[in-house]
Amino acid sequence: MNLIAQLEAEQVEALAKDIPDFKAGDTVRVGFRVTEGTRTRVQNYEGVCIARKNGHGIAGSFTVRKISFGEGVERVFPLHSTNIDSITVIRRGRVRRAKLYYLRSRRGKSARIAEDTRYKPRKSASA
């Protein structure tokens, strides 16, 4: 393992975040800490994960898309952000693409994603 990958692995270990196994097509709920003045609260953002970047590394991020009041809204979350309180997988989607950017131009029934009923958790790297 090269030096940079080793440093990234150490940083990910130091964060010790419990990140569930999810991919593009899954419906996720992200609990994001929002600071308003002196108060901090957790705001849930629920939508379809349309992309993952840089895998599970320290620079990893994912994009979540939802329809809010008839308007499509996308938000990019850093995977190891300290502002992320929780990530919960609501529903597993069955898709054949890694990036679902085509959903941006679709509305209604054509934007639906079939549920993956045959999901198997992948084996951890340590096993």
Curated annotation (Swiss-Prot):
Name of the protein in question: Large ribosomal subunit protein bL19
Keyword Ribonucleoprotein (UniProt):
yes
Q: Which Gene3D superfamilies match?
A: 2.30.30.790
SUPFAM superfamilies, sorted? Translation proteins SH3-like domain
General function of this protein: This protein is located at the 30S-50S ribosomal subunit interface and may play a role in the structure and function of the aminoacyl-tRNA binding site.
Instruction: Identify the keywords attached in UniProt to this record, alphabetized.
Output: Ribonucleoprotein, Ribosomal protein
Instruction: State whether keyword Cytoplasm applies.
Output: no
Pfam families reported in the protein's UniProt record: Ribosomal_L19 (PF01245)
Q: Which organism is it from?
A: Jannaschia sp. (strain CCS1)
Q: What processes in GO biological process is this protein linked to?
A: translation
Its Gene Ontology molecular function terms? structural constituent of ribosome
User: GO CC annotations?
Assistant: cytosolic large ribosomal subunit
Family membership noted in the UniProt record: Belongs to the bacterial ribosomal protein bL19 family.
| Taxonomic superkingdom | Bacteria
